[in-house]
Each structure stands twice: as C-alpha cells, then as structure tokens.
Design a protein with these regions (language model features):
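Residue-register detector that marks a fixed positional context within folded domains
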Residues: 1-315
Length: 315
C-alpha cells in the first residue's frame, strides 16, 4: 500500500466508516425475518477491495452476494465471512485455537457475535503477547463461560417457543471470579448481520479445509466451560502469570491496540507466535505500513463504543 492509500485509510478510520461497516443503513426487513437472522448484504465492491489492500483477504478470492439474496447461499469451495468479524481480527485460514473453539461448539462463524470475535482476538493477544504461551484452552475455560442467545417465536398454534439466534447465538462472558484485563465493548453492533460476503476457503496447515462448509443450521445450546481438577492444577502457572499481567495494569484496550497497531489478525493461522514478532517487516502482518496512534485509537473506539475503559500503564 502506498503512503497515499494509507492516508486515505486513516481518514476513513477517523470518520468511522472503515471500522464500522455494520452500522450502515439497512434496507426493509425481509418477510418472516426474526431477530438474529441474516439481513440482505450491504457489502460493496469497494469494501472488499479495501480488505484486499489491507491484506485481510486474498486478491480475487471474494464474491459479492447476488442481487436479491436475503441470506447466504455459498457455492462449492466458498465460505461466508462478515466484515464485522474481519475488522475484529478474523481472516482465513483460521487460527488453530479458533478452529478448536468452533469444533468444540460445532459452530459456524456467524454463530459468534462481533463482540465474541473481539474477545477471542484479545485472548489470543493476551496469551501470545503478554503471557508468552500459545492460546490455552484450559486458561480460556478458567476465564470465560459460554452462553446462548435465544429469541421467542410464535409457532403455528400461537404458543411461544424459544429458538437460539442464527447469527450471534453463541457468546462468551467473563466469569465473575476470574482475573482478566478489563474490557468493555459496545452492547451491540447494529446490522452486523448485513455485512456478509463470499470468500474462497483457505485450508489450515495440515488440513483440507479452513472454515467448515456454510450451513444455515442454528447453533447448538452452549456447552459449559468447566475445568477438571487436573486442568486446574495444570493451568495454575498460567493463571499466576495472568494475575501478574493484570496487576501490572494491562487492560483490554492494550490487547486491542496490538491488533491494529501490529496489523495482525489474531484469529488467523500464522507461521509464528506473536512473541517472535520482529517489527513492520514481520510475516504475520497483513500490511507493512504503520498506522498512527490516532488511527489505532479511532479503531479501538469503534469497537468499544461509548463504554468507559481504563487506560493501561504508560510505556
């Protein structure tokens, strides 16, 4: 990317357009639409060319939805991505930790709301950048609980039934007794279900696929994230390291700033962990151009909204 293109990116970030595509005006809702369903896509060619420029998707790997589509209908080899999720740290192929999360819950990408993607990205940064370990499933279970998001719907007899939301039906919440860098995110991301597009799948290392084939099945009820006694003993050194990170004053904002400051997609498979990061020429970066602190702060503000978040220690 040229300096001129980077300047344009920074200008768009300041206006909040590049960082918050999910907040665009939505068309009339489709007949029969219920809370959590997909919305007709509002993604444009310009949006996807911008992702290509920034290295977040591969050149000529994407396809816009067909006119009149109200929900995704992917072709062979395609997967359904969302701008809201790409801007919060997901790109193909998925990081082994994130793929493990998806396999554990039998989940699709759209089952996770944008805030869940932001929390997962922050967790990967916490582990690789601040603790110095690969993202650890046991530590994740120590910190977070999983929860299902349900909606009420009238059946044919007029009785109310509960359904898990198709989009955003699976989220995560910090356990009350767990130590974790403070991070408050926007309560909701308006119209994020309209930010979908198609992208050719990219296989994970030593695998034949990246994301699972797209499905419109609703998520399964969230499984409990409980630790066994053996797991509690095994992760205690990591818990101690986490407590020390929090004691030093590291916040969730610090974690998010790594994502854009280093231009790394934490939920994308990489050839090395973040503790081996070497600078602007590092192979894990989506782009070698560095962004200003003002641009990074603007992006973080789009993710956190009006929520008050503590500031981390000065460097």
């Amino acid at each position: 990317m040229t300096k001129g293109q980077t300047s344009k990116l920074e200008a768009r970030k300041k206006r909040g357009k590049a960082a918050a595509p999910a907040q665009r005006r939505q068309r009339t809702l489709p007949a029969g639409w219920i809370q959590g369903d997909f919305l007709p896509s509002t993604v444009t060619e310009e949006d996807l060319l911008e992702l290509v420029e920034h290295g977040m998707i591969a050149h000529k790997s994407w396809r816009l939805p067909v006119e009149g589509e109200t929900e995704p209908a992917s072709r062979e080899g395609e997967r359904v991505l969302l701008l809201s999720h790409v801007h919060r740290g997901f790109s193909l192929p998925p990081h082994p930790f994130f793929k493990g999360i998806m396999n554990h819950f039998g989940a699709q990408l759209h089952h996770f709301p944008p805030n869940a993607i932001a929390h997962l990205s922050a967790f990967v940064v916490l582990c690789e950048c601040f603790i110095g370990c690969p993202p650890h499933w046991g530590l994740f279970k120590h910190i977070f609980s999983a929860r299902s998001q349900t909606i009420k719907r009238l059946n044919q007899s007029g009785d109310k039934t509960h359904l898990l939301q198709l989009c955003g039906g699976l989220g995560f919440q910090k356990k009350s007794k767990s130590s974790y860098p403070a991070l408050q995110l926007s309560e909701s991301v308006r119209n994020w279900q309209s930010t979908w597009f198609y992208c050719q799948d990219v296989a994970c290392p030593n695998a034949t696929t990246g994301l699972p084939p797209f499905s419109l099945d609703r998520p399964a009820p969230a499984k409990q994230l409980a630790l066994t006694k053996a797991e509690k003993i095994h992760i205690q050194p990591l818990v101690d390291a986490l407590v020390e990170v929090v004691r030093r004053g590291v916040t969730g904002i610090d974690l998010l700033e790594v994502v854009l400051g280093r231009r790394i997609q934490p939920l994308q498979a990489q050839d090395h962990a973040m503790w081996h990061y070497t600078g602007p020429e590092d192979s894990t970066r989506t782009n070698v151009e560095c962004l200003t602190g003002e641009t990074v702060a603007s992006w973080v503000l789009q993710i956190t909204g009006a929520c008050e978040n503590p500031e981390g220690p000065d460097e």
